[in-house]
Amino acid sequence: MDSWLKRAARLLTSISFGSDGSASVVPYYPQKVRVYGEEKKYFRRTIPEHFGISSKRLFNMLSELEGERRANIHNLFVLAGGEVICECSRDGYGTNIWHLSHSMSKTVTGMAIGMLVDDGRLKVTDRLVNIFPEVPYKDKRFADITVRHLLSMQTGVPFAEAGSVTEVGWTEAFFSSSLKFAPGESFSYNSMNSYILSKIVTRLTGMTLSAFLDERLFSPLGITNYFWEIGPEGVEKGGWGLFLSPESWAKIGYMFLSGGVFEDRRILSEEWIEESSTRWATSPMSTGDFNYAYQMWVGRESEEILFNGMLGQNVWICPKNNIVVVVNCGNNELFQMSPALDIIRKYLGCDIEDALSHSDIRTLHEREAHFFDSRRWVRPLEKKRGLLYFLHLRSRESFDIRWSDILGEYVLAKNNAGILPLFVTGMQNNLDTVIERISLSRAGESLVFSFTESGVDYSLEVGLYEYKSTVLDFRGEKYAVSVMGEALTDRDGVGEYRIEFLFPEMPNTRMIKIKPDAAGRITVTLSEVPNDKIVDLLIKKVPNQNGVAGFVLDMLERRFGEGFIQKKLEEIFSPTIVGADVTHPDAEKIMEEELRRVEDESGVVRLIRSVVARFFKESVGISEARATEQTSSEADGKSSDKRGFFSSILGKIKKRR
């Protein structure tokens, strides 16, 4: 088994069951070191009726999107004929604020390759080993990998996304991989293919990918606010990590729809537009209604083009209707299997022959202004009205006295939680987090939330009438955050206090729910969106991608019962932490009781960790190929010994439970 797979298993175990030291398996370094600046508006705003599309159609589309519970939309931006006919953002976000694109980044990297091909500096038939002759490789078939194989996800290289947080030498790990299949033989989506494309741009131009694209794409399109995270080798990640605003993405999509031209300036050749949007690989039906081209998706049975990133980031191009749609979401979804995208395609990808009525225009504008308000997790208070408030003789935003019952300082029990969502800290390798204390205080008419995380003190205002924005620095990474709180009472009359942390640059949101009792104890539940459901989708793919890891998951389910993995995921992504009011006489007793409970669980945790650690030791000598290619009879024979090992260890765990 490749060493990066073993480290990935160790990392997953540390996240799932805790660790004795740092959860990270490679050194941490800050990657997101900037926050957004607003992009200027470029496109003309108009009414959809100018293009034969009714406002009623768009109103119905927005209503259906808001009613689809699986859709968690942040921004929506619709172009028709190069003009904006619909634009809306959920409260706290904005179409001119950059947003993490995830795998939509790949499309821009692919365009950079196209520019090199247009320049005559590169051919898609060039072999990778000739571009990087100094890097050794093990598998003889690796010599056959071409630029086209990288573009179309047909390299057969298994070193993939998980390796980004287990290795620092990404290029060496990529080249030293044993291929899953001969290059060009099959389709296997892998973001590291895109990273190597990024390295090719740097190798051939002597420039960073960002600098090259600033000259050839961003500046010509008037895109001034962008950011691309850098990998451990000093090169842009290529396949992910690009931050662009919806309006900027709309420019790129419209340029592509216009045959590679923007404002009469050619950005990409017609030949590259045609070649890069041609199907080069047939993707599994499980990925959706699109096949794969060059770092983008193309309709199986239509001319639609899709730039897609996980969690619901999409640029959808419909040549038939001359439409470009940009949508940012925080959805539990991989690839382009998206209920939100399905709704957009339903309304805007069909033959449109609308009856037009200007009476619908105002209704659409009101819908845009209050988009997704019905889906709020916290609801703002209404600002006070009246002459005295209008004249500013009284504050329109007075303090909500319901928060008075929770004001104070609280120490929290041992945990591995952080204000940043786990999905973000995992991707950024920023895993060494612990919230040690929290406090809530009143400052005039404002509510202030303070917390200590990993020894660093933070303090920010919680909006009660609207989101309050600031920037938080977590170990050198900078995140814009908008915060709002709401005081509620549950069915039993017990106070429940919610604080929502929106990260307008990210698909991810952190929610905190605090519930006190009369004995000085509080419970703090941290949840996030997207949540464990997205990881559950990934885990379901594990048995097909890694036979050994699949066996481990199967044995845990066998011993602890069906649903064990899902329950553990829920605990990881939505932990509940016990805390105590530092001024309460029983505070020390509360924390001692919680410490004993944690210690009782730690023995079980250590045994589970030892199971996985021992299973992945090199001495076991089980290769990926042997685990996945053996016949069913061989599998039965081999697995009996493994089950004996698991039975001896997991039997002890079951007794201790």
List PLM regions with ranges:
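Active-site SXXK
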Residues: G82, H99-T125, L150, L197-V201, ...
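A small/polar active-site loop signature that marks catalytic segments
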Residues: T155-Y189, N193-I230
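Peripheral terminal and inter-domain segments
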Residues: D2, T363-R643, I649-R657
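A short, well-structured edge-of-sheet supersecondary motif
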Residues: L58-Y93, V315, N322-V326
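Active-site helix/loop module of the DD-peptidase/beta-lactamase fold
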Residues: L100, D119-T155, S176, M207-W240
